[in-house]
């Protein structure tokens, strides 16, 4: 798993619209990258909706959800739940492997990474409560002086 102090990896993946996203392009803004096991499951849906409902409080902060489903699954998940942040389709599992969160079962662990504006990893949540995770992330960003 990436350790605090690591640079955001230079890796390219597709978003929910099939557009290429280079993670290094997130440098310049505080960035929250949260990994979740699977679209449309109860915990993952609660976590995504928690971020959606709190996006107004994530001013000038990139929020990015990542799981191993494909673009089509992410697009449906995004539209069904009116999500308002980027989802990364890690269907080849390279993003999860790079971040060190791929389970032996082939899905991502529920882990969240907070990067500062310089792209330096400042905090890792490896224990996540999906229902109120967005609020936990906001509190940690504030505690770290990144807001």
Predicted feature residues:
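Chalcogenol-based redox active-site neighborhoods
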Residues: 1-147
